[in-house]
Amino acid sequence: GATLSGGVNASSITYATPTGSGTDISGQLDLVAGVASSPAQGTSAEAAAAAVAAFANMSNDWYGLYFAASSVLADADVLAVAGYIEGAGVSRIYGHTTQNPLALDQTSSADIASQLKTLGYKRTFVQFSSSNPYAAASIFGRAFTVNFQGSNTTLTIKFKQEPGVAPETLTVSQAAALKAKNCNVFVRYNNNTSIVQEGVMANGYFFDEVHGTDWLQNDVQTAVWNALYTAPKIPQTDPGVDVLLTTVDSRLAQAVTNGLVAPGVWNAAGFGALNQGDTLPKGYYSYAPSVDTQAQADREARKAPVIQSAIKLAGAIHFSDVIINVNR
């Protein structure tokens, strides 16, 4: 075979050379000078964030990111990758496992979970595991089994299991420290069960809501694209805009079917005919102004009026108080 030189630094692949024993077949394999291609010089190992950027530049056809490196990434690399994922134009999620015991210390702010929380990243999550450096990958494995085109298929990450990951036995103060830092953990309870808690991103957003709304964003984009792609043309008229509104609403209806969205009260600022405090009986509402109100530049650019949708997330129950009144 070829001689490989180097190690962590740049390597190169050159011509085959005899080992000094056995039969030299390098000539038969055309691996010798004058026949084989010129030696190929390698490159030094790239930084983690640069590798992610290269993948992103190559393809948009991926969503979850986890480093299965033989050694744990340095905190600086984790922060660089998290920053890239947070600011990228394509929605993705990055997971990281920490084994640093400082994550269990309520007084520490130097651990990676604390640093990511301070930065307020909603597209990165951290899990503490003392035994498994790849524990957070199990959260990806569970979450990405969801088929959003089904009925009642969405789930919350809390209360789930992590096959192959040993549960942690924590003190009350250690559990409180992880929760305060928005650091997930697979933990053993004294009722002989083990669960993932709390199922959150670094900024405290729930994993399932970020995952679910990312799916919805992609699903609506795909549906609107297909409507434009398959029609001979959609006219730049109010009936034409209604075609797009119907397309959007069909995907919002699927979000109700799979359990991401549900009827409820809209508690944010209103738009169109929707006011704050109104009930969304379907769980969603979509609105687009008349094309008559468009700026001439937008009309000449063949843009549709902006379509706005309001959705009420179904959420999930994680805690419950039960009051029992007793009468003798």
Identify the role of each PLM range.
Residues 4, 18-20, 44, 51-54, ...:
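Generic structural signal for short, flexible, solvent-exposed coil/loop and linker residues
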Residues 57, 114-244:
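Extended basic-aromatic, gly/pro-enriched interface segments that bind polyanionic ligands
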Residues 196-328:
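Structured, hydrophobic secondary-structure cores that serve as assembly/anchoring elements
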